[in-house]
Each structure stands twice: as structure tokens, then as C-alpha cells.
Amino acid sequence: WNAIYDCLFFCINGDIYNSLTPEQQKVVDEAGQKAVDYERVINRAGDDEIMDRWQNENSVKITKYEDMDIDSFKQAVDGVDEWYQSELESQGYEDAKDLIETFTKEDTSSASKYDVEDRSDLDWPEQTWNFTCSTTETSTWAEGGRKFGELMEKATGGKIKVNVYAADQLTNGNQSEGIQALMNGDPVQISMHSNLIYSAFDPRFNVVSLP
């Protein structure tokens, strides 16, 4: 069990994103990245408690990374990334190589301060975006959505507001319909879901599951 594996994607409707100026897009990108960083930190905060409970109450054996035979695992999966790149390219996805390199390289970044500058000078349109996720109101995913809304409202001087709808409320709890609603841009404009859900619509989301 890898306690630091995160496979969530924070996605915004393409038409809405493309309607923004490049400067506005940078603000959205920054707020989205910081919201994801925030979700990751609060999500991982309970790892030790979870591992203790699994070991002490559920008889789960956990082997630390440094005690695992990683080299033999790497040998066993050698070539899988090249194979999947070829599969994607055969389906017309020319960006497959760049995506795989991005998601398989070592991450040397660190958590950033969860704040943004006031960029209300960028002539933002007044809009309300609906954020959805499949987990509950008290989940870290929903908290990530609220953090994004907080950052966007500050950055835009209140022009962009974000409503958070947990448990895919806007599509009666149906995750697949929620993704379709995101693609349509109505009633969902932003969502956070596992790559397993997104990959049903686009196989490139499976890149993050490569060994």
C-alpha cells in the first residue's frame, strides 16, 4: 500500500477555460494547483492513523518502501510505459509521450502557501462555477473545492464564485453523468474525480496508473 499515491484530477470545462484570457488562465491554474496541494496535504494527514488501525485491528501487514524489492518490480514492469504510449498514439493521441514523461518523472516540488494575489484588475466576467466531487461534504475532495473557491474569489475580487456540490448532487449521484455534465459545461463547470472515472471518457487519464 502506497500511502502517498494520489490519482485525483481537478478539471474545468474546456469552453469556459478557453474563454478566459491567458492572464486569467494563469490565475485559474495557480488557484487549482494550490487547491490540489491543499487537498493532498490534508488527505495524507491521516495516513499514520489509518496504517495503525489496519495493522492493529485488521491484521494488515504493511511493508515500508525501503524494505521492498523495488528493483525486481521495476524489471517486471520494464517497457509498460512504452507499450501504453504506443497504444495511445495508435488512437491518435499525439501528446502521449509528453503526458507519460510528465507523470512518471520524480516529483521534486514542495507544498506551496495556499494563497493568491489580488488580480481583480484582469476584467473578470461575473460568473458562478459549480464544483462537484463524488465524495461527501466533509471529505478532503470537497475541502479542496472550497479552497479553490476561496482562492478564486480573492483573486477576482469576488467576480468568480464557486459552489461546492459533494456526492455528485447535480447528477443525482451518478459519477459518469457528472463527467458528461462537466464536458457540456452545464450544470457542472469544475470537478474533482479519480482518474478511473475520467478514463472512461479519455484513456489518457490512465497514464497516472502506470507503474
Which role does the model predict for each range below?
Residues 1-211:
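N-terminal secretory/targeting leader peptides
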